[in-house]
Amino acid sequence: LIPAHAAEKKSAMIECTPTDEKLVFDCMVMLTGKKSGEVIADAEFTVGADMPSMPMAHNVEPVPAHSVGNGMYHARITLEMHGEWALKLEFTKPERDLVVSKLVFSKASVSPSDGHDHKHEHKKNKD
């Protein structure tokens, strides 16, 4: 028998936090089925990263994610610099799949990427 979620696309909620080591982040991944919302507890995957603004120039060797229970997985990644990174989750179990999530990594925090440059300010015209 094949589990109901086996052929279902995966949804990954990723939270990364800076460690005491420069450019090293602890990432927690919560996996669920995209449609069913069911926890995926038996996945095997690696976490790698590419910098979308500089394709092929900056990428991180994938590291294995380790299950900590209830559909939660941990991976520690080391980046080359701060900025926007596309985290790539490459699955081998329950089936081959790829999930990509863009995050902005800074010295103090990690936040989801919304495609906007957060370094500029909007100026309002005063009439």
PLM feature spans:
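N-terminal soluble domains immediately following signal/targeting peptides that reside
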Residues: 5-127
